[in-house]
Amino acid sequence: MAFTMRAPAPRATAQSRVTANRARRSLVVRADKDKTVVIGLAADSGCGKSTFMRRMTSIFGGVPKPPAGGNPDSNTLISDMTTVICLDDYHCLDRNGRKVKGVTALAPEAQNFDLMYNQVKALKEGKSVDKPIYNHVSGLIDAPEKIESPPILVIEGLHPFYDKRVAELLDFKIYLDISDDIKFAWKIQRDMAERGHSLESIKSSIAARKPDFDAYIDPQKKDADMIIQVLPTQLVPDDKGQYLRVRLIMKEGSKMFDPVYLFDEGSTISWIPCGRKLTCSFPGIKMFYGPDTWYGQEVSVLEMDGQFDKLEELIYVESHLSNTSAKFYGEITQQMLKNSGFPGSNNGTGLFQTIVGLKVREVYERIVKKDVVPV
C-alpha cells in the first residue's frame, strides 16, 4: 500500500472548512414533515442517469416500476419512497415538430418550462398532477398520466436547473459530468453494438447536439451541490474508455450534507490501496482526496482512478472513508454487491453513485427531522 498525505495548509480557509463541517453535523433543519423533498439530476443523454436512479431507489427499498395501469411507454418510475420523472416529458415539441423548426431536444424553445415549474411545485406541495408523456419510441407526446406526490421526487434530464423557478424548488442538485472522450466511447459502444448505428451517424449526431449541449446543458453543472465527473484514466493509455478516473466534487458550506473525506478531513491525500487487503490487477487503483475550487466555489474532491477486482474487498476502502451517510459499517459495500450487475459497479462511477444516493437519503432525513448519525 502506497500512501502520501499533505496536512492542511496553515490558512484560515482550510481550518474554517473543517470547523464549519463539524458544526453542521448537529444542525437540525426546520421543515414540514409531510413536504415532498425534490432532487434534481442533470446530465446529457447516455450519461448513466438511469443506472444512477436504479442505485438510488435501491437504497430506499422497493423495485421501481411505471405507474400502475399507465402507458407502457411511460418514462416515470415509482418505488416505495421515490418517484422519478423524466424531464423529456415536458418537451413542447414532438420529434417532427423539432425537425420542422430545426431545433434539437436540448434547445430551451423545445421545452414547456411553465408546465414543468407548475407541476413540480404542485407535487412538492403534496398535490397530484396530470403529467404529459414524451414517447421515445414514436417521438410523439402521449396522453397525460396521473402522478401522486411522493416522499422523494427526483426530476432527471437535460434541464432541471436551467429554469430558475424550477431550480429554486430543488432541495439538492446533482450533475453527471462525462468528458467528451468517454461520452463518445460509451455512445459508440451503445449505439453500434446495441442499436446497429454506423460510426458516421454517431459522429454526426454528437456534432449536431454539441452546440446546444455547450450552451444550455453543460453550464448547469456550476449550480450543482455534488458532481460526479468521469474522465479518462491517468494510469495507462486507454482510447476506448475501458478504465475511468472518476471524481466526486462536493460543495462546501451546505446545510444539507457533509462532504465525504478520506483519512483526514481538510488534508490532501494520495493513496494506492492495492496490497494484502485489496486485490488490484491491471491497471491498478489510485485514490485522491483534497480541497479544490469549482467555478469559484470551495469544494472537496474524492477521486478514484482504476477498477476493483473483487467488490467484497471494497469494505477496505470504505473503512477509510468518513461522512459517507451510511447507516452502518459496510453499507456501501453491501449496496455495491447488491447491484453488482449494474454498469460501473467495478469502478468509481458505481461507488460514487452509491455514496451520492446515501447523501440523498441524508438530505431527506434532515428535512423531515429524522436523526442522522454520520459514519
Curated annotation (Swiss-Prot):
Its EC number is 2.7.1.19. GO terms for biological process: reductive pentose-phosphate cycle. Pathway: Carbohydrate biosynthesis; Calvin cycle. GO terms for cellular component: chloroplast; supramolecular complex. Disulfide bonds join 47-86. It comes from the Eukaryota. Keywords: ATP-binding, Calvin cycle, Chloroplast, Disulfide bond, Kinase, Nucleotide-binding, Photosynthesis, Plastid, Transferase, Transit peptide. Light regulated via thioredoxin by reversible oxidation/reduction of sulfhydryl/disulfide groups. It catalyses: D-ribulose 5-phosphate + ATP = D-ribulose 1,5-bisphosphate + ADP + H(+). It is found in: Plastid, Chloroplast. InterPro entries: P-loop_NTPase (IPR027417), PRK (IPR006082), PRK/URK (IPR006083). GO terms for molecular function: ATP binding; enzyme binding; phosphoribulokinase activity; protein homodimerization activity. Residues 1-31 form a transit peptide. Belongs to the phosphoribulokinase family. Component of a complex that contains two dimers of PRK, two tetramers of GAPDH and CP12. This is Phosphoribulokinase, chloroplastic. It comes from Chlamydomonas reinhardtii. The gene is PRKA.
